[in-house]
């Protein structure tokens, strides 16, 4: 689960609400001045998308990168952090999943120190709470989390979510009419994770059935 990267890219990350963050990340990808970025916000605001997109960007440039989903930490140990300071990019997603666990907090603290000492790694972490609100037990780790730049990811409006749905469909080569897009958007939960999952399901179904995404077809596939 650690290395798996989906089809997220910086190009299909809807950046209008988070332009300052994107600009700063781009600058540090080419000229590493700020090593640490802390991204926070509630679920489905795009944290995972952005972290995976950053990894994809580095990999396409033949640079070393790793994405670690800490909400899957039951499947691996703190040994996952060993030698990560040798990577050019380290993305740690869902930091709140391991906060409060002393073993993980100590391992995170050690990783921060190694990355800081080495000076060649861009470290980007995400969490649902701000650095000051995260219930960290280890005081030294709490101070490390305030080292770099902190950004709250701003949620998309409904209009922006609908635009992203259409954009994602276009990038997948899916013919999605405005009528069908509006139908999907009004019938499903309006979070991007749900909408993306539905789009992937519809993409596979339409290819297998060789059908266009009409409203009746969407109804049958999504059980609406």
Regions found by a protein language model. Give the residues of each.
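AAA+/P-loop NTPase substrate/partner-engagement loops
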Residues: 60-89
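Walker A/P-loop nucleotide-binding motif
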Residues: 33-51
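Short regulatory helix/loop adjacent to the ATP-binding pocket of P-loop NTPases
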Residues: 131-146
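Conserved AAA+ ATPase "sensor/coupling" helix adjacent to the nucleotide-binding pocket
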Residues: 148, 162-175
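C-terminal helical "lid" of AAA+/P-loop NTPase domains
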Residues: 182-186, 193-207
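Conserved AAA+ ATPase "SRH/arginine-finger" region at the nucleotide-binding site
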Residues: 148-160
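Conserved nucleotide-sensing/catalytic segment adjacent to the nucleotide-binding pocket
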Residues: 79-125
């Amino acid at each position: 689960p650690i290395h798996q990267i989906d089809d997220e890219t910086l190009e299909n990350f809807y950046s209008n609400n988070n332009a300052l963050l994107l600009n700063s990340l781009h600058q540090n990808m080419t000229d590493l001045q700020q090593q640490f970025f802390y991204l926070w916000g509630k679920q489905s605001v795009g944290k995972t998308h952005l972290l995976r997109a950053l990894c994809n960007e580095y990999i396409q440039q033949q640079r070393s990168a790793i994405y670690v989903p800490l909400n899957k930490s039951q499947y691996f140990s703190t040994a996952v952090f060993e030698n990560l300071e040798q990577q050019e990019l380290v993305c740690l997603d869902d930091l709140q999943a391991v906060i409060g666990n002393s073993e993980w907090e100590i391992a995170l603290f050690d990783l921060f120190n190694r990355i800081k000492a080495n000076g060649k790694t861009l470290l980007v972490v995400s969490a649902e709470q701000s650095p000051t609100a995260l219930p960290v037990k280890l005081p030294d780790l709490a101070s490390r989390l305030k080292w770099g730049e902190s950004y709250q990811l701003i949620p998309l409006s409904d209009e922006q979510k609908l635009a992203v749905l259409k954009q994602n469909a276009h990038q997948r080569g899916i013919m999605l009419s405005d009528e069908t897009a509006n139908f999907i958007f009004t019938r499903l939960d309006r979070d991007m994770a749900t909408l993306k999952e539905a789009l992937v399901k519809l993409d596979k179904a339409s290819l297998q059935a060789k059908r266009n995404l009409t409203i009746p077809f969407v109804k049958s596939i999504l059980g609406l």
